[in-house]
């Protein structure tokens, strides 16, 4: 699994002649990030070291209310059916995974008693299994015990194709077996370099078997508990108004000592990012605002308020434009993925549109401190970032590409070919920064004689997990759309397998696939399949770089801005935010310090 030099370094850490920090620094020098270095140590038999806790409260409760703003409000509270981070966040208020990611990218146990390692017998040396020990005494909010049966059920539920779970990719090639009431073993079909995927982080949160057993498969959307969660988390469910409000109260039987700190919790939806920032930083009406995607000059003015501040976390989030490879207005055999887009199926047309995205203006006019221009979909960790790509803004070159492809300006000034006008429907969620970005791109397209119609959809609807909603980003009833890909773990496998052909959304899959461009490439599929089983970390990183480069070469999408994650926080709140996962994956450690 490891070459001699790497094995020698791991042995030094085991013996105590090299500390963990020195090992991580050596890994950084060869392009391996701290989170991945930690994973290498775990595979090599070195147990995960728990960092010192920064949590100061000494008793459970007494912290009063925690009021949060998610202007993209949750619309569903089942982590397996959540197609967007807002629904993962709403679910994570109540449901928990076996482990979560801390700000440094280290795994921390939640429902697990410990993190698996070779040293504690949890990881197989051949990389083909991981054994989790569960915490004893954990109870669901209705008093039923949490056991290994619940963990096994979540695997069965998610891998069932009729369930159409958004998490199916994580569980489809694994087997989960019950060893005893408090032990489960995950078996991988092949050596698995990144084993900490299943049951980890917000997407790995676990639902109760006794409430969902009758709703596995094609009944998954009929479960009433999709809207009224019964979890194991620090807060118990009180109320849910989809898109508007989620409320919870303290769980006095919570399994972590001295936690939680707050007595009640509220996640308010609606409004926009600007009003959310103001409500935290200027008026102090709320304690925390997530995803503050606000023009930087606006945020600078808001930051003059005295009640709070903005916080920025660097990660791998990217704002990008997806290009539809299928015709949103046509179906073949009731399946859109079998159609070809009349304009965007031509690589020259896709490359021309990419040339019309003025990233530098978008950065300067909108993102400022919160983003940098990029040509890469994969922008971190560093060893996975391609140096082979570049971007350019040129209306002249775009026009020539279109001319050569047969798209000539007509009498009305709009390009046409074979009687078809070059017109694009460009959609995104309702947000000031995104509407400005759309306008900048439309202006350039008009100069290239392309007619662009802009559409904005209320964020709670655009990112909804409601399969009946025709305006979701996964339905993609437009030609191009602007959105973001946000990190949920340090490893890029989950993000990059998004564009594998097996994950194309369809009516059959209840629109749960994340391959929203409907891109199908045997070359790309082969690279991802190889990366999923490559143990050598350097070779594996090279495969993900290659996958990124294929997306760039084929212009499957147009990366625009490598975004920082920005939130608004009251001066007294002490949140624990990690760029490797969702904002509230460490909610149990939040408290207030007056």
Located regions from the model:
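N-terminal export signals
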Residues: 23-48
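Mature extracytoplasmic/periplasmic domains
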Residues: 216, 370-389, 566-569
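Extracytoplasmic/periplasmic ligand-capture domains
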Residues: 2-18, 22, 26, 50-61, ...
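General beta-strand recognition
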Residues: 67, 108, 129-131, 183-185, ...
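Protein kinase glycine-rich loop
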Residues: 70-120
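Surface-exposed binding/hinge segments that line
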Residues: 167-216, 239
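Active-site-proximal polar cores
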Residues: 560
């Amino acid at each position: 699994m490891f070459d001699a030099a790497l094995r020698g370094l791991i042995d030094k850490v085991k013996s105590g002649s090299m500390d963990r920090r020195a090992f991580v620094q050596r890994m950084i020098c060869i392009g391996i990030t701290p989170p991945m270095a930690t994973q290498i140590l775990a595979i090599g038999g070195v147990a995960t070291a728990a960092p010192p806790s920064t949590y100061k409260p000494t008793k459970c409760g007494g912290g009063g209310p925690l009021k949060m703003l998610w202007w993209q409000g949750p619309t569903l509270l089942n982590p397996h059916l959540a197609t967007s981070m807002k629904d993962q966040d709403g679910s994570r208020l109540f449901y928990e995974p076996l482990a979560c990611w801390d700000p440094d990218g280290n795994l921390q146990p939640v429902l697990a008693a410990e993190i698996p390692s070779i040293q504690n017998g949890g990881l197989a040396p051949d990389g083909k299994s991981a054994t989790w020990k569960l915490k004893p005494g954990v109870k669901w909010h209705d008093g039923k015990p949490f056991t290994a049966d619940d963990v096994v059920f979540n695997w069965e539920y998610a891998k069932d194709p009729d369930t159409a779970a958004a998490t199916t990719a994580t569980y489809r090639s694994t087997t989960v077996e019950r060893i005893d009431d408090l032990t489960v073993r995950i078996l991988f079909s092949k050596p698995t370099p990144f084993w900490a995927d299943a049951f980890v982080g917000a997407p790995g949160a676990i639902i109760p078997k006794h409430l969902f057993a009758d709703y596995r498969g094609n009944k998954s959307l009929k479960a009433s508990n999709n809207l009224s969660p019964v979890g194991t988390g620090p807060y118990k469910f009180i109320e849910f108004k989809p898109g508007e409000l989620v409320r919870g109260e303290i769980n006095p039987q919570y399994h972590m000592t001295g936690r939680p700190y707050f007595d009640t919790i509220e996640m308010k939806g609606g409004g926009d990012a600007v009003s959310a920032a103001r409500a935290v930083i200027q008026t102090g009406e709320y304690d925390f605002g997530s995803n503050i995607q606000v023009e930087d000059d606006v945020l600078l003015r808001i930051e003059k308020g005295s009640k709070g501040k903005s916080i920025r976390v660097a990660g791998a989030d990217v704002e990008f434009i997806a290009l539809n490879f299928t015709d949103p207005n046509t179906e073949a055999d009731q399946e859109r993925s079998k159609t070809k887009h009349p304009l965007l199926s031509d690589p020259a047309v896709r490359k021309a549109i990419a040339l019309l995205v003025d990233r530098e203006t978008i950065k300067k006019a909108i993102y400022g401190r919160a983003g940098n221009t990029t040509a890469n979909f994969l922008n971190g960790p560093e060893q996975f970032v391609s140096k082979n790509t570049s971007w350019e803004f040129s209306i002249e070159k775009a026009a020539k590409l279109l001319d050569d492809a047969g798209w000539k300006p007509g009498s009305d000034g709009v390009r046409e070919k074979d009687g078809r006008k070059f017109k694009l429907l460009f959609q995104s969620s309702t947000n000031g920064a995104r509407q400005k970005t759309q306008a900048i791109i439309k202006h350039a397209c008009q100069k290239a004689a392309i007619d662009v119609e802009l559409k904005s959809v209320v964020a709670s609807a655009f990112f909804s997990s409601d399969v009946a909603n025709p305006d979701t980003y996964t339905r993609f009833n437009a030609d191009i759309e602007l959105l973001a890909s946000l990190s949920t773990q340090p490893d890029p496998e989950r993000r990059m397998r998004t564009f594998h052909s097996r994950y194309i959304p369809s009516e059959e899959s209840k629109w749960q696939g994340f391959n929203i461009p409907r891109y199908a490439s045997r070359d790309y599929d082969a690279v991802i399949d190889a990366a999923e089983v490559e143990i050598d970390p350097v070779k594996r990183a090279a495969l993900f770089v290659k996958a990124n480069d294929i997306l760039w070469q084929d212009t499957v999408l147009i990366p625009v801005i490598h975004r920082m994650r920005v939130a608004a926080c009251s001066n007294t709140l002490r949140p624990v935010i990690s760029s490797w996962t969702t904002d509230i994956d460490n909610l149990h450690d939040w408290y207030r310090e007056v």
